[in-house]
Amino acid sequence: MKLSVKNLSKTYKNGVKALDGVNLEIGVGMFGLLGPNGAGKSSLMRTIATIQSPDAGEVFFNDINVLKDNISLRKILGYLPQTFGVYSKMTADSLLNYFAVLKGVSNKKERVELIKKLLEITNLEDARWKNVSGFSGGMKQRFGIAQLLINNPKLIIVDEPTAGLDPAERQRFLNVLREVGSNSTVIFSTHIVDDVKELCNNMAIMNNGRILKQIKPEDSTKELKGKIWTKIVEKADIESLNNKLNILSTSFNPD
């Protein structure tokens, strides 16, 4: 399996160029898309998921021309956006059952077995009969993984899934994603470096709508080794140091 993105560009009506000639080759396994807020990650995710159209470029997943045959892509796609709504009075079981019917699982016995399996994978067995609207942030994200796995997707897209999660929930979510990502092509966008280092076997760094580098996570910081350091200085010296050095960030200590 391979996802190919070729010269993808997108400019919004307000003049913001979200994608600027993006090229990527992504195979099976976990692929991290790392970049700050506003880098264009979500725009790229939505375009690959056929939610929005680009101004130019091509996207292929195996032999599917994604931009011209979005129906075929959606049959094998699992997508988890940054935020998603749920029906306020539906339990995890009833909502997964509803999604399974929508995705073509017509046999009731098959749906029951599938839902049980999905809740086990996502560690939500104990919450099966609870309303999803009352779930914590991490539980909702894991429920999102459960619903996207219903159609056994070959391409999985998860957009900033760990943002706002506490450390324990974040780790639980990463464990679930790690388990489901071994036999599919999974694109995982984040601005958290540790997420990519812990989870992904390949990655790209994105900013200002461009792919700056596609690289292995373990190699991503080698070029910077020995070139970045922290130093305590007097406030009065900051201006002169700014003129001599490339300062990434500063913080003021009143003590």
What are the functions of these language-model segments?
Residues P36-G40:
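Walker A (P-loop) phosphate-binding loop of ABC-type ATPase nucleotide-binding domains
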Residues G57-K68, S72-L73:
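Conserved ABC transporter NBD signature motif
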Residues N97, V101, K109-A127:
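Conserved ABC ATPase "signature" region
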Residues N131-F135:
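Conserved ABC ATPase signature
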Residues I156-D159:
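Catalytic Walker B motif of ABC-type/P-loop ATPase nucleotide-binding domains
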Residues R172-D255:
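ABC transporter nucleotide-binding domain
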